[in-house]
């Protein structure tokens, strides 16, 4: 049987390219369309070229950037993409039609809604237009969550300072303010009380104006204000080292939610994630409570065919609160780590679903039978500030090297892969914390508790040597 063709809208985020392209290309022909060439690293571009039967880049971009080169690394694409949503939809349709694509997918949060519109017009399976819009706009998402049968929270859209003042008066504190259109918890801010809240709101508003998004990204209001969900990890875990939230990775097939794996987390820096552990060590009762909440969240959004990444707050008395859900794969290495631990390739399974619907062969319950745990772990400037190695007044640092003592590892926990900064790496400490990952590690061990303890030790004991003459404050 000849391979079918899938159009991949290539951009940042979701399942990392080092797994995604190889997994999909083993069973399908890949046509890669790159709407934002500046959002593709050199390594990503090489994988696209290696595994795609055709690669198309947005020609309009090259009219103003004829000598463009892909960057070595990137976290957020800091360039303009002025096309309207309708223009983006038409581009997707044009490429898909030319190559007679049997499915269309993306790992990027910002193109979820236009892709859903393109899929619908092409008669292909997708998340569904209205569902995709709700999964993208966090204000609409919260309204759907509140109607889904899980814990409802007070919520209010916010555009102006006046809107914010009304929201904090109505909702009270603690209050969480979220940009409705971004990802990676960028700009998410907790307000503990009203004192100084106006200035903080204006500061966040001003900061977000420096973070570009495609003009195709639409929303009803740029922020949503919500009651903050208070976590209580001690009501869920017997051991320390875990956070008060989890994520569930799954698929939706013909409107039915299928959970695959629950990921444990380690405590955040503000709202910046620090580590994900595959899979959870929670007991069966806890797992069932979480799965039911995730099911209500995703089916409540009305999603049809897509991957899902659902974040759930673990609250007192084992009550759950919905943080958010995305109609795409999780980022970091969560999807590759599922394959390492369970041998299940979610990237391929998503395309199976988009091509064959319920005919695709899928697991019917949470994956089980693992013999080890894998963790994604990042170190940020805040970790080194807390250990006194980065001066509190510093605004920029230049790194000489970073070291991790061997004695930080507990049990049989070991580093599988690692990425350290090269000498001379400059870090702008004014940037959002998530933009400033300094070290990334993949850890493996037979005990989740030992892995979590190792992460805690690394965060406290890792050392950073700065080039003192280049520290600016």
Q: Model segments located where?
A:
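ATP-binding N-terminal substructure of ATP-dependent carboxylate-amine bond-forming enzymes
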Residues: 1-131, 135, 140, 162, ...
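Active-site "cap" helix and flanking loop/linker of ATP-utilizing ligase/carboxylase catalytic domains
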Residues: 2, 289-310, 316, 326-393
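A conserved helix-loop-beta module that forms one wall/lid of the active-site cleft
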Residues: 121-187, 210-212
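Conserved ATP-binding module of the ATP-grasp superfamily
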Residues: 152-153, 174-177, 194-239, 273-274, ...
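Short beta-strand-to-turn element immediately C-terminal to the catalytic PLP-Schiff-base lysine
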Residues: 158, 188-193, 251-253
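ATP-dependent carboxylate/phosphate-activation module, predominantly the ATP-grasp catalytic core
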Residues: 227-230, 238-303, 326-349, 376
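Conserved protein kinase catalytic/activation segment
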Residues: 318-321
